[in-house]
């Protein structure tokens, strides 16, 4: 997530060129992009509040894990993350999220999940003017509301309660 801090004119190969000066504070980087090329290189405005709300709703949905090879899915996830589309990034976060009671992720799954979560939290924090930590908390709260995760947690609580009753009767 970068911020345009100015527009400057530079002489390049004898031509005068207007450039956006984009600062990436978290990455400690400054980028200069020719004004006419801004959209073709992927620069865009921040998402609006409606898009953020839809992204958080997407995260609450049921994960869609395709049964294709991991390398193919990883490429698709990477493409969604790099697209910059907040809804597509939310889909990656939803699909790769693992709660405490689920099996662990592979290293590459974890890397993709963290990249998607980072991009999503940066955008939400900028749009809602909150900290990235608060944005991550919002995302994780919505992930916990997912039908699969909520039902599984309730089911496990019911099993534990039944086990406790069985142990009490045996004693």
Predicted regions and their residues:
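Charge/polar-rich, low-complexity and marginally structured segments
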Residues: 44-171
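A positional/architectural concept
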Residues: 1-43
């Amino acid at each position: 997530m970068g911020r345009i801090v100015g527009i400057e004119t530079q002489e390049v190969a004898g031509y005068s060129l207007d450039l956006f000066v984009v600062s990436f504070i978290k990455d400690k980087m400054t980028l200069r992009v020719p004004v006419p090329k801004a959209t073709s290189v992927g620069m865009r405005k921040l998402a609006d509040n409606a898009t953020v709300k839809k992204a958080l709703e997407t995260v609450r949905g049921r994960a869609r894990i395709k049964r294709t090879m991991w390398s193919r899915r990883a490429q698709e996830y990477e493409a969604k993350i790099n697209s910059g589309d907040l809804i597509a990034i939310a889909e990656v976060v939803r699909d790769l999220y693992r709660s405490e009671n689920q099996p662990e992720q592979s290293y590459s799954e974890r890397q993709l999940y963290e990249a998607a979560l980072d991009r999503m939290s940066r955008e939400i924090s900028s749009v809602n003017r909150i900290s990235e930590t608060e944005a991550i908390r919002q995302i994780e709260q919505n992930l916990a509301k997912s039908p699969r995760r909520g039902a599984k947690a309730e089911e496990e609580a019911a099993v534990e309660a039944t086990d406790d009753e069985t142990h009490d009767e045996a004693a």
